[in-house]
Structures are given as C-alpha cells and as structure tokens.
C-alpha cells in the first residue's frame, strides 16, 4: 500500500505523523496503545484489515501515530487523553486544509477511543460518524486493577518482557512467531517508559463520561464478547451513555480489531457508513440519499451464537430467504414490512440482527 507520510503540529507544538491513501470521504483510523505507520503495514493481519477497510482504494484512509509513538515526536512529557485529542485535532485540521472535505469519519479502538471521544465532543462539526471498538469511557470499568499495575510495572522494569506479556491481551491466539513479531514491533514503536505511561493512563486515569452527551453524530460501538483486555460490559456501558449509538457485540477474544476474524468488523463499518443519515461518503460534491435514520438513543444489535455464523457472515452467504421463519413466528419479509429500522439498515448483518430483535419484542406484546 502506497502511503505518503505527512506531518501536522499539535497546539502544544508536538509534531504528529499521519499517512493518507485512497479516495472518497476520509475515514480516520485512531490507534490504540502504540502504533507505527511503517511497521504496522508489515503485519499481515493489519494490512489485510486495512485493505478491506479501504474498499480497494475507494475509501480514503487516514492513519496517525500519537505523540510518543511511531514516526511522531517521541520525546514527550504528557500522553494524557487531552493531549492525544490535540493530536487528532492537528491531523484533522491539516487534512481539511488539503482536501475539499470539512469533516471526517473516525474509527478508534482500544486506548484511542477516549481520545476520539474527547475530540468529537469538542469538535462535533468535524466528525460525521464515530465508530468505537473495544474501548471504554471510564478506567474503573475494566476491573483489572491489580493485573494492570503489574503490567505497567513490568513494562517499566523490562520492556522486552513486558511487551511479550501484553500479547496475551492484544491477541490471545498468537503463536510464537506472531508473539515474536509483536514484541519487535512494540519495542520499535515506543520506549518502555512511554508505553508504560500510556497503559497506566488507560487503565487508571481515563474518564470521558462527561463528554458523551455532547456527541451528536451517529455512533457505532463494537465490542468482541470475550475481549481479554476490556470486557464486553465496557462497550455496553459506553454505548448506553451515548445519545445516538448502536451497540454491536461480536464473537471473538482478540482486543485489537485487526486480529482474529475482522470480516464482521469491516462489514459492520461499511454498513454503518453507508446507511447513516445525512452524510457524504464519496468525493466532495457527491450526495448520498437520505435514508431516514432512527431517532436518537441506544439501539442494541444482536448476533446469535450460531455455529459457523462468523464464517458465513464474512463469506456473505448468510442471507435468509424471505420465508425463513423467526423465533417469533413471523417471516423476515413480514418483520421488514413493519420495522422502520429494517428499512434503514439494508440487507446486511445489522439489518438481520435488528429483525431478530424486533421479532423477539413482538413475542412479548
């Protein structure tokens, strides 16, 4: 993937590196703990996920390295959520200065989530859509205080061993080769002190709950059910506090979105960006049809734990026939006729999940 590297200056003078690729409406990828614009692309899982998100270059992807990591300024004194929100602001303003767009969609995961929330709350006019994966609004929610302190201390004491230990949370299914690659990547993406400071901030000092009601843009919250770093309830609790949120629990235990089966994540993001109301996702000047989005408030989208459902969804083969019966005794076609959310979301996993939820509600009427 060709990726020109650009640099923007944050409000406190820190230089932030970012890359651009593709065309269309910008989707800003806000990384988690640490990142490296060049080394990330050497990870085949990351590259495949990014390639799928880019839609063959039809979607403009913007990636950044937060301060203290990757190609951005490494020697920094402050890595707080507030400062990382400044980093996002610098990149977005630089992007707006060089394109015909006046807003971006944001996809943030893990520790990048609180910074994206803080930025979107301060600049809602700059964010068309907000997508959050595997993140939280308040550090107290993860319930891993003792383990978190041990990891922070280990990383500060020995970055090589500490980076190895963290693999179990980022990608629990790693074999030795993947674990070795991650250790090399981590140690070349940030110093041990910065890595420890970032982890400590995320695990003990994050609280953006006061910003959530300021988020007026459509928001999608994704969370894997068996996430080993931030448990599922972190995403559920976050979504419940957002005024315009969809919550989509997904199968899997990997924390980073590009590990494990990322096809449902890519598909959910594509569906969300395509169906959310009132925003343009092509080149400047192109208009999208108005789809009549549902009113504000949390909508929970349910995937059932059917055997092989993930592979079927990623293969695009799980398309029930119009007469396929739901547990409520109604057909998908009959549910579609009565459910306005169905029309909003199109024939995709989000739509099918809403149909199941609607049919269950009808059983209780």
Task: Please name every model-derived segment.
Residues 286-365:
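Catalytic NTP-binding/metal-coordinating core of nucleotidyl cyclase/transferase enzymes
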Residues 142, 160-206, 210-211:
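Conserved alpha/beta-hydrolase catalytic His-Asp/Glu region
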Residues 117, 121-122, 127-157:
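Flexible "cap/lid" loop of the alpha/beta hydrolase fold
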Residues 228-234:
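Conserved alpha/beta-hydrolase "acid-adjacent" motif
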Residues 215, 221-223:
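Short beta-strand/loop motif that positions the catalytic acidic residue
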Residues 10-73:
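Conserved HGGG/HGGXW glycine-rich cap/lid loop of the alpha/beta-hydrolase fold
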Residues 85-104:
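Conserved acidic catalytic loop of the alpha/beta-hydrolase fold
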Residues 245-288:
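Catalytic active-site module of serine/aspartate enzymes centered on a nucleophile-bearing elbow/loop
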């Amino acid at each position: 993937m060709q990726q020109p590297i650009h640099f923007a200056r944050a409000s406190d003078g820190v230089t932030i590196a970012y890359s651009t690729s593709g065309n269309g409406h910008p989707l800003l990828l806000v990384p988690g703990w640490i990142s490296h614009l060049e080394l990330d692309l050497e990870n085949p899982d990351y590259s495949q996920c990014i390639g799928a998100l880019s839609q063959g270059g039809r979607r403009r992807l913007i990636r950044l390295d937060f301060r203290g990591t990757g190609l951005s300024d490494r020697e920094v004194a402050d890595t707080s959520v507030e400062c990382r929100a400044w980093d996002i602001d610098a990149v977005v303003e630089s992007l707006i200065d060089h394109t015909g767009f006046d807003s971006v969609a944001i996809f943030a995961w893990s520790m990048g989530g609180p910074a994206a929330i803080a930025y979107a709350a301060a600049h809602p006019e700059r964010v068309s859509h907000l997508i959050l994966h595997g993140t939280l609004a308040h550090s107290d929610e993860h319930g891993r205080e003792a383990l978190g302190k041990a990891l922070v201390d280990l990383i500060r004491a020995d970055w090589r061993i500490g980076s190895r230990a963290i693999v179990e949370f980022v990608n629990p299914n790693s074999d030795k080769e993947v674990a070795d690659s991650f250790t090399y990547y981590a140690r070349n993406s940030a110093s041990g002190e910065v890595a420890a400071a970032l982890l400590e901030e995320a695990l003990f000092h994050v609280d953006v709950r006061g910003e959530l009601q300021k988020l007026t843009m459509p928001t999608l919250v994704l969370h894997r059910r068996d996430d080993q770093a931030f448990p599922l309830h972190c995403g559920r609790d976050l979504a419940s506090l957002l005024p315009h949120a969809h919550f989509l629990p997904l199968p899997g235990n990997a924390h980073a979105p590009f590990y494990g089966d990322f096809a449902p994540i890519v598909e959910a993001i594509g569906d969300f960006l395509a169906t959310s109301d009132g925003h343009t996702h092509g080149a400047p000047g192109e208009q999208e049809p108005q789809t009549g989005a549902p009113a504000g408030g949390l909508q929970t989208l349910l995937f059932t734990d059917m055997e092989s459902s993930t592979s079927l969804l990623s293969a695009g083969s799980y398309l029930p026939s119009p007469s396929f019966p739901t547990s409520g005794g109604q057909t998908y076609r009959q549910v579609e006729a009565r459910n306005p959310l169905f029309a909003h979301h199109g024939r995709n996993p989000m739509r099918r999940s809403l149909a199941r939820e609607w049919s269950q509600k009808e059983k209780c009427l």
